[in-house]
A protein has these predicted regions:
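Electrostatic, structured charged patches in enzyme active sites and in nucleic-acid/phosphate-binding
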Residues: 1-266
C-alpha cells in the first residue's frame, strides 16, 4: 500500500471515486493509485496487459514481476492492481476494534484509503475465484507497523470470503519472470512486424529446425532473416512471439539466453 504523493483528504477521496478509480473490470478498471500519485524510487512500471488490454501501473520491480507471473498463468482472467479497501469507514472500524492505528496522511491527518496490490480473478472448475495479494520485500516483513496494516487488510478480505496473502521477493521465481518479461511485448505482433502469414509459417519452420539442431535462437533468427529477405530483427521478434503465445514450448523456468541453444519441446 502506497501513500499518496499529494495531500489526501475527503475531497481527494470523493474526486477519485467520482473518476471511477477502483471500479470496473478488465479493460475498464481504473487503479486507485497511479504512479504519479505515489512517491517513487525510480522503479515504476507501465505495462500493457495481455488479458485486460489496458495499461497497468506498478510501484516496484516486485509488483511488476508478480504481474508477469499472473499474465503467464492460463487460469488468471483479470488483474486489478492497487485495489481500494472501501468503504473507508470499514477499515477504520476494523483498526479501532483491534487496537490498531489506521494509516493517515501526516500532512492532513485524514485517514488514507488502504489498497491491496492485486485483486486477481482465477478460473477454477468452471467458476471464478478471487484472490487478494499484497507484494512486499521480505526485509519489511519484520516491521511491527507493516504487520499491523496487514492485519487490517487481512480482516477486510476475510469479511468478503476472499483468500488474502503476502507475496515477498523470496516467492518470486526470478528466471521465469525474466523470460516472461523478454517475450511479453511480442505476444501480439500486429503492426509491429512487416511480414505476411505465409512468411511467418516459413520463418517458423526454418528457425524451429535450426534451433532443434542446436543453433542458438539469435543465430537461427538472423539466418532466417537472410534467407527470407526479412528486416533485421524480425526473426528474433518471431521467436519471442512464438514463446509468448505458447506456439513453441520451452522450459520457462530456465533463463533463456538467445545467444545459447534452447530445447524446444516436441
Amino acid at each position: 500500500m502506497g501513500r499518496p504523493r499529494a495531500k489526501f483528504n475527503a475531497r481527494t477521496m470523493r474526486k477519485w471515486i467520482a473518476e471511477g478509480r477502483g471500479q470496473g473490470h478488465g479493460q475498464d478498471y481504473l487503479s486507485w493509485l497511479k504512479v504519479q500519485n505515489v512517491p517513487s524510487q525510480g522503479y515504476v512500471h507501465r505495462i500493457m496487459g495481455w488479458k485486460t488490454k489496458r495499461r497497468h501501473e506498478f510501484m516496484s520491480n516486485n509488483e511488476a514481476g508478480y504481474f508477469h507471473l499472473l499474465e503467464w498463468s492460463p487460469f488468471v482472467t483479470d488483474v486489478r492492481e492497487q485495489f481500494p479497501l472501501l468503504p473507508l469507514d470499514e477499515t477504520i472500524a476494523i483498526a479501532k476494534d483491534h487496537g490498531i492505528k489506521h494509516p493517515t496522511d501526516p500532512r492532513t491527518r485524514y485517514p488514507i484509503v488502504m489498497t491491496t496490490d492485486f485483486l486477481v480473478d482465477v478460473q477454477r472448475n468452471g467458476s471464478t475465484v478471487q484472490y487478494a495479494r499484497t507484494v512486499k520485500p521480505a526485509k519489511d516483513l519484520c516491521s511491527e507497523r507493516v504487520l499491523e496494516k496487514f492485519e487490517i487488510e487481512r480482516r477486510y478480505w476475510v469479511r468478503r470470503g476472499v483468500d488474502w496473502a503476502v507475496v515477498s521477493d523470496c516467492d518470486l521465481p526470478v528466471e521465469l519472470i525474466k523470460n516472461i518479461q523478454w517475450v511479453h511485448q511480442y505476444r501480439d505482433v500486429d503492426g509491429k512486424l512487416s511480414i505476411g502469414s505465409t512468411d511467418v509459417e516459413k520463418a517458423e519452420r526454418i528457425m524451429a529446425e535450426l534451433i532443434r539442431q542446436g543453433v542458438p535462437p539469435a543465430k537461427s533468427a538472423s539466418t532466417c532473416d537472410d534467407r527470407l529477405g526479412l528486416a533485421p530483427g524480425t526473426g528474433l521478434a518471431l521467436v519471442r512471439h512464438f514463446l509468448a503465445t505458447r506456439r513453441w514450448s520451452v522450459d520457462m523456468s530456465k533463463l533463456i539466453n538467445p545467444q545459447k541453444p534452447i530445447a524446444l519441446s516436441a
